[in-house]
C-alpha cells in the first residue's frame, strides 16, 4: 500500500529552547484512518502545524503523497486539508462565503466553489445557516464549518486537530459518521485526540505521542489487546438488584 504521509527524524525546537518534537518517525498509509493520541503538550499540535506549513520544523523530512515539504511546499499544502483546534475564520463573514473564499485560495473557479460549498454545508447540516454570520453559530456548528472549509479544495489527506473538543455527545457521533463516510470514499484521515474511545471508534491505526516522541505506533486492534482490564471493588451500603450502566462504556461491566 502506498504512503500518504512519511515523516523521518522530525524535530522542532522553539526560540525559548523548548524542544517540542524529538526525532519523530511516522508513516500513514494511503486510505488509512489514523489517530495521533497524546496528552496536552505532547507535540500533537506542533506536528500538525508543521504538516500544514504553519510551523517551521527544525530538522527532519516530511513527505505527503510524494511532495517533499522543503522542495514542493505548495503542492504538499494543496494535497491536505486542515481542521485546526481553534476557530480561525472571520466571525462577521457569512458561512457560505467562508467556504467559497477558501476555495478561491486554491484557484477553484467561482461556479465550482459555490457548488462545493453547497455540497459540504448540506452534508454537514449547515445549509440553512449559509447566509448567517459565523459568529452566530454554535461551537459545534463552527467545528463543522471548519471541516467544510478544509474539504472544499478536495484534498487527499484530511487532518483534524481535536475536532470534537467541547462538542456534545450527539453531535460528536454525527461527526464520527460523516468522517467515516469520507474515509470510505478514499480520503486519508489523521485525527488528533485525547480520547481513546474516539480513536477506537474511528481509527484503524494509532500513534501515541508523549513529550515530543512517538512511544507507540501500532494497529488499534493490537493496542486494545495490550490494555489491561482494571478491577474496582465497591463497598455499597445497599444491595443492587440490577447492575448500573457505566456511561461511556456500554456493555463493558463484568
Please provide the spans of the model-predicted regions.
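ABC transporter nucleotide-binding domain
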Residues: 176-254
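Catalytic Walker B motif of ABC-type/P-loop ATPase nucleotide-binding domains
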Residues: 158-161
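Conserved ABC ATPase "signature" region
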Residues: 100, 104, 111-129
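Conserved ABC transporter NBD signature motif
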Residues: 60-68, 75-76
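A short, flexible loop at the N-terminus of ABC-type nucleotide-binding domains that lies
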Residues: 1-7, 11-23, 73
